[in-house]
Amino acid sequence: MSVTIAVMVGVVCVAVIGATRQQDSFYFDPAPVSQDVVEGSGVRLRCDVSNRHQIAFYWTLDGKPVLNTSRRWQDGSDLRISWVDRDQDSGSLRCIATNVTTGIALRSAEAKLNILCKHHASSLFFPI
């Protein structure tokens, strides 16, 4: 009888370990990337994972959560900025993806906005 119980317990443990491992198998696809953007224009930073099942997303700027405003907000798993501002949007942006069942979170690589001045950007496109 104890052998049967040990086998049953072993099977249950394997099933639970296998289920947990499968839920936590996700990676960024696509991961956020640094971009050039003209100050005052809009930008979208993409973020998604290979397996969205039970995944919640949020963004950080220099390690602090990005709060939704009318100018900057999370759109699904992406971050949108309608009016890029050098003072408010410069820094290290990261997407955080968390499996809400297990609590395991992945932090993306750093993405930065290379914010170009309007004056400099226009001279690039319309040389004098």
Put a short name on every predicted segment.
Residues 2-128:
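Immunoglobulin-superfamily
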